[in-house]
Amino acid sequence: MKLSVLSLASLASAAALNAKVLTGKSLTRRADFCDQWGQVTTGNFILYNNLWGQGNADSGSQCTGLDSSSGNDSIAWHTSWSWSGGAGQVKSYANAAYVFTPKQLSALGSIPTSWSWKYTGSDIIANVAYDLFTSSTADGDNEYEIMIWLAALGGAGPISSTGSPVASPTVAGHSWDLYSGMNGQMQVYSFVASSQTESFSADLQEFIMYLQSNQGLPTSQYLVDVQAGTEPFSGSDATLTTSAYSVSVA
């Protein structure tokens, strides 16, 4: 079953309300937050609950929490949810958003990352995915969305104008199906892993370079957001646990 994923960037970034700031080189678990736009800041990360699509559900809830952080670029966290109804509609995008100065793609050096995670629950339809956004200016509207799906659980699928991949490349040592489609005025590219990858290490710059060479992504664009999280459609007693996540932009 092919499902549509809506863009999350503007709603996620608009959620800067009542942020709780944590400091220190090493932090341990804090209480979960369950409000729609709940967030916590630690190091170079903002951890969002981001229940932007909860109105699409007949019932459900979701809570997110910080488990630990080390330095500025490494975090462990979890999110737990149950959602029913609203078939084919994303309910949220709990994610760890990396805070950095927007950088033009032509000047990007690397985006090294690693992510170890696991999912538990019943009847889960969801993804586990990076979400990158670019704009023609450092503070402009998002024009391109680049998703990197490490898992498509229960039949979840990306935005696609045709329902079929436009290519099946090998990038960063893994095989992917690449989908292309529009979300309003924004071009969306989604790399969907051929097999579920629960321990992932790569340079995300390789995905950007592939799109520049093969799909015409302009090098004049600015990278403005790097996020990693999960988009649930439906399921019960589900928990995504990120035991270790790191990223940086150089």
Swiss-Prot record:
Keyword Cytoplasm: no
Protein name from the UniProt record: Probable xyloglucan-specific endo-beta-1,4-glucanase A
Keywords: Carbohydrate metabolism, Cell wall biogenesis/degradation, Glycoprotein, Glycosidase, Hydrolase, Polysaccharide degradation, Secreted, Signal
Gene3D superfamilies recorded: 2.60.120.180
Residues bearing attached sugar chains per UniProt: N72
Source organism of this protein record: Aspergillus terreus (strain NIH 2624 / FGSC A1156)
Signal sequence, start to end: 1-19
Compartments it resides in: Secreted
One function term, GO molecular function aspect: cellulase activity
Name of one Pfam family that matches: Glyco_hydro_12
Entry keyword Cytoplasm: no
An example Gene Ontology biological process: polysaccharide catabolic process
Cellular component aspect of the GO annotation: extracellular region
InterPro entries documented for this protein: ConA-like_dom_sf, GH11/12, GH12
Stated role: Catalyzes endohydrolysis of 1,4-beta-D-glucosidic linkages in xyloglucan with retention of the beta-configuration of the glycosyl residues. Specific for xyloglucan and does not hydrolyze other cell wall components.
